[in-house]
Amino acid sequence: MDIAIQHPWFKRALGPFYPSRLFDQFFGEGLFEYDLLPFLSSTISPYYRQSLFRTVLDSGVSEVRSDRDKFVIFLDVKHFSPEDLTVKVQEDFVEIHGKHNERQDDHGYISREFHRRYRLPSNVDQSALSCSLSADGMLTFSGPKVPSGVDAGHSERAIPVSREEKPSSAPTS
């Protein structure tokens, strides 16, 4: 039996068979016209894809950077306060969990929860890890790298989330 596998790039081109925002992270934030009638955007022009990249960039997608000197994770958590977030390190992984109870917004009541897990490079100094939340809701998790051959230290511990009053300097891609 052959199963057709479709690349995510073409997923939105199928219009009404794959609703763009009905079941993703934006659930409960209200719908736009093209969410209910996604095939209309393709009638304007076959090259017009309004929500393809906007949805990806605004859906809480994280950015991981690992260069020679440091390891950094940027994660959009604008709907969560520092009290709603838990960041902990277990072995070679960092786990970021966010949950807020049901609260009222413009469209009714909503509760949110997410869980992300990232593998830390083996040369990240786990004793010097830090995590901060900017005023615009960007969580930044970072840690310096140590030279090869130096013990980076591995232990299970919680990382406190500090609040910054200035907006994030993270790229918006």
From Swiss-Prot:
Major localization class: cytoplasm
GO CC annotations, alphabetized: cytoplasm; cytosol; nucleoplasm; nucleus; protein-containing complex
Domain of life: Eukaryota
Keyword Transmembrane assigned: no
GO BP annotation list: actin filament organization; apoptotic process involved in morphogenesis; embryonic camera-type eye morphogenesis; lens development in camera-type eye; lens fiber cell morphogenesis; microtubule-based process; mitochondrion organization; negative regulation of apoptotic process
Residues at which Zn(2+) 2 binds: H107
Region of interest (Required for complex formation with BFSP1 and BFSP2), ranges: 1-63
Pfam families in the record: Crystallin, HSP20
Modified residues (Deamidated asparagine): N101, N123
Residues recorded as bearing N-acetylmethionine in the entry: M1
Annotated glycan sites: S162
Compartments where found: Cytoplasm; Nucleus
Modified residues (Phosphoserine): S45, S122
Keyword set includes Phosphoprotein: yes
GO-annotated molecular function: identical protein binding; metal ion binding; structural constituent of eye lens; unfolded protein binding
Residues covered by region (Disordered): 144-173
Description of post-translational modifications: Acetylation at Lys-70 may increase chaperone activity.
Binding partners and assembly: Heteromer composed of three CRYAA and one CRYAB subunits. Inter-subunit bridging via zinc ions enhances stability, which is crucial as there is no protein turn over in the lens. Can also form homodimers and homotetramers (dimers of dimers) which serve as the building blocks of homooligomers. Within homooligomers, the zinc-binding motif is created from residues of 3 different molecules. His-100 and Glu-102 from one molecule are ligands of the zinc ion, and His-107 and His-154 residues from additional molecules complete the site with tetrahedral coordination geometry.
Protein name listed in UniProt: Alpha-crystallin A chain
UniProt organism field: Sus scrofa
Recorded name of the encoding gene: CRYAA
